[in-house]
Curated annotation (Swiss-Prot):
The modification Phosphothreonine is found at T625. Residues 596-610, 618-632, 797-813 have a biased composition (Polar residues). The lineage of its organism: Eukaryota, Metazoa, Chordata, Craniata, Vertebrata. This is Zinc finger E-box-binding homeobox 1. Keywords: Activator, Differentiation, DNA-binding, Homeobox, Isopeptide bond, Metal-binding, Neurogenesis, Nucleus, Phosphoprotein, Repeat, Repressor, Transcription, Transcription regulation, Ubl conjugation, Zinc, Zinc-finger. Its main location: nucleus. It comes from Mesocricetus auratus. Residues 17-30, 428-444, 470-479 have a biased composition (Basic and acidic residues). Residues 504-563 bind DNA.
Amino acid sequence: MPEDELPADQTVLPGGSDREGGAKNCWQDDVKDDECDSDAENEQNHDPNVEEFLQQQDTAIIYPEAPEEDQRQGTPEASGQDENGAADAFSQLLTCPYCDRGYKRFTSLKEHIKYRHEKNEDNFSCSLCSYTFAYRTQLERHMTSHKSGREQRHVTQSGGNRKFKCTECGKAFKYKHHLKEHLRIHSGEKPYECPNCKKRFSHSGSYSSHISSKKCISLMPVNGRPRSGLKTSQCPSPSLSASPGSPTRPQIRQKIENKPLQEPLSVNQIKTEPVDYEFKPIVVASGINCSTPLQNGVFSGGGQLQATSSPQGVVQAVVLPTVGLVSPISINLSDIQNVLKVALDGNVIRQVLENNQASLASKEQEAVNASSIQQGGHSVISAISLPLVDQDGTTKIIINYSLEQPSQLQVVPQNLKIENPAPTNSCKSEKLPEDLTVKSEKDKGFDGAVDGSTCLLYDDCPGDLNALPELKKHYDPEHPAQPPPPAPEAEKPEASASSARDGDLSPSQPPLKNLLSLLKAYYALNAQPNSEELSKIADSVNLPLDVVKKWFEKMQAGQIPGQSPEPPSPETGTVNIPAKSDEQPQPADGSEPQEDSASGQSPLKMTSSPVLPVGSAINGSRSCTSPPSPLNLSSARSLQGYFCVADGAQEEPQVEPLDLSLPKQQGELLERSTISSVYQNSVYSVQEEPLNLSCVKKEPQEDSCVTDSEPVVNVIPPSANPINIAIPTVTAQLPTIVAIADQNSVPCLRALAANKQTILIPQVAYTYATTVSPAMQEPPVKVIQPNGNQDERQDTSSEGVSTVEDQNDSDSTPPKKKTRKTENGMYACDLCDKIFQKSSSLLRHKYEHTGKRPHECGICKKAFKHKHHLIEHMRLHSGEKPYQCDKCGKRFSHSGSYSQHMNHRYSYCKREAEERDGTEQEQEEAGLEALMNEHVGARASPSQADSDERESLTREEDEDSEKEEEEEEDKEMEELQEEKECGNAQAEEEEEEEEEEMDGAKDEAAAKTDGAVENGAAPQAGSLEQKASESSEQLSEETTNEA
């Protein structure tokens, strides 16, 4: 560049902060920057070699006009300081006078101006801006940025109906939700956050892909610091040793394998759409301090389970990252523990725990030795798996649990913090007497055995068959199980808890209740086991096979009384469930009688007791204070479902006894009949679905306790309100624990502690029954009934609408009706206050709560959130490809693939087609030329042939000509075949034969002449031509014969 064109001013601007020297300073300063680029020369002054180099350049850059001062100042690249006050790198850049792009090197700026702003004959310049391009395709692509709507390219076939247009860039979409996600690109909103790596996404599809890819499932610390709530597994308890023989069950893998728990968030911050995940303490009965680590998709609460109750009773909720779900699943451990305590005759499990703590007699127990239960408060939950999403879309959460000592249970309202997720394998609650697999299938029970005898979570899980040996050793058939007195304080030591639990039983001697609970669990799993299964059960329980067989027969015949608080026979187990009444937990004494019924779904007998006062333990809010009173949870198995009832009047009277017992009706419980005791439980026959916990929105003072799964689950919500976890009916309005399961899937558990914030877990079937317990002092509450019957939920905002469509083909009870409109014709979400105009919108919205994609492919069972996605997916199975490119003819089954192709086709689509056509044309032309030359050479007389030209022929050329001749012959044969179809095949063949004979004779003559004249390559050429003609003649003859 000529020196005179460079600015004369050599001033170097200080620190780039004063750039007001305009273009002159800019250019000169850049020359300096060019030389200062390398680290070694950072501090050197201006190098004159640069000027010399610029003067030697052949191409001079002519600037139409000098850049304006204010233009330079106004560009963000030219001015600016970083947040620390130091001039940032951009402030040191040289900006282009035409487009304000910044460059650190002057040479880079020169190149930019040359290639983008210098116009010449070879360049393609944009008519709307100063950009120039070397290739037309680049210009065409660039021109799209000036178009008002890029959808112009899409206006082909189905592209003309894009009615949702972006106001920012003009891009249009066929569906509103596509525009919604597109707008996030402009706004910068990224509502989807990966719970593992904290990466955020604006599109749900990107989020789902990221989660499915499992690229960030490791528990690596973020920014060098371990994430709170995601600390590496720690097994503080000395007895908590990793047992190599207890690998995580395969059920935990699927999509959520190795996903660590997310930091707990409070219920009121859980939204229907992805939100910032933060710590969200949930108001719960004082929970047990469980530092629970999660590894391999399993939440292990066996870590430090301490019975210390927090004065506030605030429990950290466990947030399980939802696999592909928008919002995480928040599980209140204290709620779940309450449920689990009662689940298998919670007392039995507790007793098992006691026994385990007292003496780890069974090998399995020792292997699973997840101690920390000994720390005063035994955590019921030793491990929680992340939600497992099956192929059919059903979701299940597997809970490995062990019940606490009665005192702890009563103190369940202890501070339950899930802060240190530890690997499940290494940290398990010491006494995992039962592996609780929450399943909703008829043959699946809480034993945690999918197969009937295997633990879903661990192979060595003490639960199921493994847990039984411990009990069997201490089995005392004649020792009646007596409800333990409630432990007044959470801090009560285990020993006292265990003794209290079982009345007179010593911790080393499990009461009959334990065995009964285990037997019931087996019964719930399989009501009619074969001889082999019976023998396994007998071995695990350490009872004679005849005894076990007779017990099963009696259960099937309904001879075993469903409910005696302390039946000598294996009928009942008392469970103390602490109700969270303010700071004092209310122990719930629940006795679960054995199932009475010939069928595996024998009705559950409920002891009816005085109605529970709404005021005391029912208040969902943490504030309700009531003296701790044991909840008597006696549950009997109903013919088709279980109900959990809590008897409120037992060991320590409450302000009013919390009576959650259901009437003893074996056959009627399944019917949607009002239950005389506390609540009207809408009961519908349910296949045995273990622990199907329906989520109900309830006012703070509502309480209900019904369980509709095989195992009786009576839960007192952490909010001191009993949680109704009856699958058959959910009558309660409890804001706490919600476990919903699809008919044939394991229900997921989620605890909700906010009064009107019920969050359901994925793949749940929601149905509601409008039954209000007459005893309820509060206004009638609309009850949510899992699996099937729809009820209006009591929500101040609107009448709840339950969409059966959201259910996963609920096989159990048929839903009464599908989504129901509210009074004003709108569709209201039963899980939040949102209202929608269309049922399809509600279905999609439900996905935010449940993770259940409403539209499922009938062939591969893949589910989609939007119906049109399913429609396009089905084309993969049908092979339909309705979208076609008008340039290259390529077809597409998905509109997205087609749109992407159309958007970028100008860079390759047309060229590919042209290249393909050009190549074909060239080949055809080459073939024709070769044939013409060949025929001409064959027909030419030897005398006319130039000897020099013949000498120039090489063998390779002859071979090439032969190949071309063969190709030509092939083409001719194809033409002949077509002509034969027209009836002219024979005559033409004869003519060709004659011509070829003549050609052959000429070839022979030419060969002889060539041999006489030359003895080099020419004779070979003649012979090759002769052979070629002969071969072609033979081929034509064969073709004729075939014709």
